[in-house]
Every structure is written in C-alpha cells, then in structure tokens.
Amino acid sequence: MKRNEVNRNELSPMMKQYMEIKDNYEEEILFFRLGDFYELFFEDGILASRELELTLTGKNAGLKERIPMCGVPFHSVKPYLEKLVNKGYKVAICEQLEDPKSTKGMVKRGVVQVVSKGTLVDLEFLKEYDNNYIGSVLDFKTKYILTYADVSTGDFYVCELPYNQDKLLSEILNLNLKEVILADNSDTNLINVLKNNYGIGITINSEYLEDSYESIYKDIKDMYYLAGIKHLLYYLVIKELKDLSHIKEVKIVTKDNYLSMDVHTIRNLELFETLRLKERTYSLIWLLDKTKTAMGSRKLKYWLQNPLKDIETINSRYDQIEKLNNEFLIKESIRNDLFEVYDLERLCAKVICGSLNARDVLQIKNSLKVLPSIIDKVKSLNFNLNISDHNTLYNLLEKAINENPPLTLKEGFLIKEGYNEELDELRSIRSGGKEFISTLEASEKERTGIKNLRVGYNRIFGYYIEVSKGNIKDIDDSWGWERRQTLTNCERYITPLLKEKEALVLNAEEKIIELEYNLFLEVKEAIKKEIFSLKTTADEISKLDAIIALSVASEEYNLVRPELTTKNIVDIKEGRHPVVERVSKSTYISNDCVMDENTDTLLITGPNMSGKSTYMRQLAIIIIMAQMGSFVPAKSAILPVFDKIFTRIGASDDLVSGESTFMVEMLEARNAIVNATSHSLILFDELGRGTATYDGMSIAEAILEYISKNIKCKTLFSTHYHELTSLDQKFSNIKNVHVSALEENGNITFLHKIKDGAVDKSYGIHVARLAKMPDELLKRADEILKVYESESKVKKQEQFVFDLTPTKKEDSKIEQELEKIEPLQMTPIEAINKLYELKQLLKK
C-alpha cells in the first residue's frame, strides 16, 4: 500500500497528523515519534525495513487493511540513523512537542531536525580527524562560487574558482564534501559525476536566505560571495532546520595564497590516504599526525591541504618548531595537558544544536580545567596565542555538574549537591521517604509475624505490601490494609501511611527531575553566552597542538629546517621520502636533488623498480612539508616557494568516466601544461607509455620540449625512452640523471642512488625474474631481446652509412632554382611548368 493511494478521510486522527507532516518532507525518511518508539509508515517503512533489516509489520490506521510499518526504540535510534545517513538517505526526526501526560487529545508533533551526510553533529557519527563539509556551488557562467561549511565545528568558507569543471570537481573531492547543493541551472554532467562516480549527495535548490544570520557575513560586499553564502544558508536553516548560532563569521578563502594541488596530485602523493587501499595508515598525514586533540588533528590536515606561499608566515612556524625543540620539558608538559582537552569545537556545536548532554558538559569542564596550565606554559614560549582560561564558566560547571551523570537528561543525578537549595530540600524529602519505606518492611514483619512479607513497587500500583496465599489468613482487619491486586501466589495490599509516603517520594522525584533539567538548561545557557570565546580558544588550542605535532615529528624522524629563497633553485642534500623510510624494512637510501637557476628539468632514466617514482614523490613531499611550515626529511634543503604542483605518476582515477588510460594521461598532462607557471613543479612519470612506442615517444619528447622552451618550471621527467636523453644537447636547461644499478654475473642490484648522466637499460627481464616468471619464458625473452638489440644496431649502422654518402648535388641545384623563382610574378601555367621541372630534377 502506497501513501498517495489511501483515502485520507478514512484515516485515524494520528495518521492524518502523520500525513500532514510527511507532505513537507517528501524526500526524507520520516521517523515519527510515538511514545517510546520512532515509527515509519508506508514507503518509508518498507525502505527502512530493508535497509535496517527490521521486521515489516502492519498498523491499524482506520483503513480496511493495515498499513506497512516498522519501528525502532527512541533510546537506541542513533545506530539506525547512522546506517541510513551513511547510505545517502536524509532522515527527518519528528518529535512529540508536548508532554502526553499533560495534554488532552492529540499530542502536538513536529520535525525538529533533518539529518544528512553533510550536517551530522553527533560525535559518534563523525571521524574526529576529518571535517564534515556540506557545500553549495553556484554557476555564474564565467566562474564558480563554492561555499562550504562544517556544521559540527562552526566553520564556514566561501571561495571563487575559475570556470573550469575539472578544477571545481577537484576542489570538491579535495574537501571531501559529503553533500553538494546545486542551483537548477547546474550542468547535468557535473550532477551525474558527483552522484554516480563519487557517491556525493546532491540536492537541487534555487532559494536564498535573506535577512537572517547577516552578522556572520556583515563585512562581505561581493555580490557573488553573498549569493553563495545565502544559497547554502537557506538549505541549512530552512530545509534542515539547523541553528547556526555557533558560526561566528564566514571566511573568504583566497586560493592564490596557497600552494595549488589538484586531486590527482593529492592522491598520487598519498597525502591523506594510500592509493591502493584508500586508508589513512601509511599516508603522509598518518606520519605527521602527533596531535593530542581532535581539533589539532583537523588543523594539521588543513595545513597539509593548504600549504602556504608567504615566506614570513612559513618561517614563523619554523621558529615555533625550533623553540619547541629547544624546550622539550615544556613541550611534553603541554602535550600531557592537551591530552585532557576534548573536542571543544564540536561540543560547541552540540550546545547550539540542542543535543548536548551532561557528559558533554563534563567534557567541556574537564577541558577548561587544564587551560590555566597551558596558558602559563605558552607564555614562557612567547607564542602569540589568544587562549582564555574561562575561569568563571569553569567554576560554574565544577559546582553544578555531577562527576558521573547519566546519559539522558530525564534520569536525574545531573546536578551536584549544594548547587541549588530547593533541589537539596527535595532530595532530602525523597531520601526520608525512601528510608521510611525501606524500614517499613522490617517493622511490618515484626508487628504481624508474617516472615515472608515484603514491600515492593511497580509503575501501575506504586508501593505495596505483598503477602503469600498461605499467610492471608493471618491478616487482621485492624491493621487497615486494603487489597489492591490478586496474583496466583500472593495478594498485594496498600495502607494509608504507605500511600502518603509514596506520594511524598514520587512527588519529590518528579519535581527533582524537572528542577534538575531546568538547572541544566541554565548551565547550557551560560555556556552559550561564551560560545564564540570558546570557539576562539578551541581554534588557538588546535594551532598549538598542530605545531607541537610538527615539532614531535621533526625530532622523531630527524627532520631539518629548510631555507626558503627567492632564487629559482632547488638544493636538497640527502633527501628522503618520510613514509617509505618509516615503513621500509631495509636501510633507506637518501638522494640529493639539485637544480640551479639554469636547470629546470631533470630527465630521469634507470631500471624498473629502482626508485624513480619514489624519488619524484620525495621532492614534491619535501616541498609540501616545507610550505605547510614543517621541517623536512633531508640533511639540508634550500627551496623556492612554488605556486602549483602537478603530477602524473602511475595509473590514476578518471574524473569523467569512459576515458581510456592514455586519454586520462593526456588530460592530466594538458592540465599541467596549460596551468603551470615558471614557479610550478611538474612530475611526469613515464609519460606516453599508454600508446604505441613511437607515438608515446613523440608525445613525450614534444611535451618535454614544450616545458623546457615555454614554461621553464622545475620538472622531474622519468622515462624509458632512452632516445630522449639527447635533448640535453638541444636544451641547456635539461639535465640527465639516472638511478644506478650494479650488474654482476648476470645479476642486478638496484642501488637506488641518483647519479648524473643517462643510462640506456631498463632491466625489464630482470624484474620479470624477480617476479618468479617461468624459466622457459625468461629464456625466450632473453633471445628476443638479443634479436631486437641486434636489429637496432644494424639499423643504426645503415643510417650511419646512409648519412655518410648523401647526394647533395641535386639538392643544391634545386635550391639554386628555388632562389630564382618569384612566385608573385608567375602566371599559373608558368608555376605549374616550373613545379614539373623541379620534380624531374628531384628524380635525378
């Protein structure tokens, strides 16, 4: 049965209410609160039962047949929400907005929040070291405006991107946006690629939020930025019912201030996840992340995503790392303090979004507790950080919140004794009543002589005295007992005194829970008032944690401070790939990388498996680490500031489905060639291998020439086309280097050492031997190789002989005749005759 097929007039009042609410949330799965359960009906129920593996049942709704229904307990709803959201569904949470006990008739209900991939705020749903961004894209036909926010931290950004869909897509993937809001004029190809290739949630919306949250963008005047901001705000506030009071300001991201890296570069260099397993382990961020807080981990990732171009700011980070390296005891003491700091950024979001519980408040309090200690130590380091101690708020939380509060807010035991006089009095009443009831059982046993008498309690009948069937005869009417319930083996009684004490206890219990809840809301309001100050402190703590992490990494991995220069030189002595070195079981071989102002390109030849790709990645990683403000893995490093890095290393994912490997290779190469400047870095690994040999070699040579002649940026170009090594004779800015290997008695040892000059062997058959290819196959490969090498030598000799005896006589006659011709003074017939004469001369 489908929702749109039923006659609404026949539905029960509750189901009519459901239908009215569901009409406003057609795209969402509606969790409809009924008592202790969330229930799902019609298509939502069928879908949820399948996705969540729930039993699909039916519910009486006033119709002749039962409607499809399934449900989940309200107290354990989070795992179900997480499962649906991770599968790309949006969920609307409909709550009871009134207390059923105090309401006559239908309980008022309404949707209080919409949960989707991009707007999660519950910490247990989120990866602590990742931001959870939702974005908006507006297409202005000359440029894109990308606006993105992390509701869980209160970060909100806007930036302008060139009108290039690949660059837009690359930015969306780099930010790992979970949802994208697009206007209705958006390109359908972009929509399909985002949704189908990358599983990003897409919503089409062309509405803009006016006259709300203006304070967060009051200083922004650009009409394009404002449109992007209002577009995203409309979705968050109107569609998803988010309270964004924890967002202080929208930050404009100026892309030109940062080193640019497209999605291919970030993936090829394995900055955040490995190429093969798509895991964080063994990526660069895994190596560098020595942070103690979730906020610091996210900040470090942001620095790695956005390496700087301003030398002064970069050197400032170097100075802080040096200071920390010289103050080991202070650094370790701060790290111990940071370990006690919880995720203040996301806790602030929970304050605003209404999902804060007492344990969250306790985490805020425990975080604030260590701030004075951190502040004192930071002062001794002379770091310019704006960390407040929040002493007043800490004292309030220390006095108010119990050390072991319950998970939910309606269980009581939230507030400490001594915080509120009325609460203490109610607790005393409750305690006295419970104490009376606990002693009543003993006194009644003694008074009546009924040894198996007991005092019990249940929700329906309250407190009662229970007597077994065999002792009923001993009950005296003078005791004033009133029969309340008959069971198979016993009778239950109440007394006036018992009911009086019960009313006292239960009334006090109810008042205690209500008062504690209201006191907790007051505490939450006190936190709310300091929300922006807390967010500032959280941001400063994250910076401190991140820079300390880089200091720890510099000592653990023997990193050095690089020297940044305005000269166009790269001078790295004994450089290392930090991740490969860390996981390598053998001794890592370091290598120099030297390119003076007259050398733009290193043309790298050498055997397979010798380390060419690692050497290339190593340079890029050293540059990225240097520009994010980190020390680098080398004995010494002098580096310029780069504006962009482009890589084509190995197989890469296709942004637009359906392209061949070679086409993807060419598209990536074109991206580098078109967008690189003289201050960029290009890494091309065996370009041209995806097509026929001569085609590939021709393209590789043409690209190499183009870079050397037109772009003149620092480039590492590895190749197995040994014919290209002669280009250093044609272009003085190309230098040949090779990865050395030792050949002894038919065995090859890869030395992994970069040396000057070129080599003309790739040792492919040796690599096949290492791969345990069959001996018969290897023997045949050797035979074929010898034939090819022999033919190659003959061809070279033939070419040499041919070149020694050219006939230049006719050429010179032709040249002489051509010199005499005046094309503009010839008739068409004369021109044809002259062409015929030249052709005959050429035949001779």
Task: Please provide the spans of the model-predicted regions.
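Charged, surface-exposed helical/loop "interaction arms" that form contiguous linear patches used
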Residues: 357, 367-370, 417-418, 444-452, ...
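Short, small/acidic-rich helices and loops at N termini and domain boundaries
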Residues: 357, 837-841
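Charged catalytic and DNA/RNA-contacting regions of genome-maintenance
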Residues: 2-323, 332, 336-339, 343-349, ...
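ATPase nucleotide-binding head domains, primarily ABC-like/P-loop NTPase cores
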Residues: 42-43, 222, 226, 292, ...
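Amphipathic heptad-repeat alpha-helical coiled-coil/stalk segments that mediate oligomerization
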Residues: 207-212, 260, 271, 275, ...
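Active-site phosphate-binding and catalytic loops of NTP-dependent enzymes
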Residues: 94, 117-126, 243, 379-382, ...
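Extended, charged coiled-coil "arm/hinge" scaffolds of SMC/Rad50-like chromosome-maintenance ATPases
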Residues: 487-525
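Short hinge/gating elements
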Residues: 59-70, 157, 213-219, 272, ...
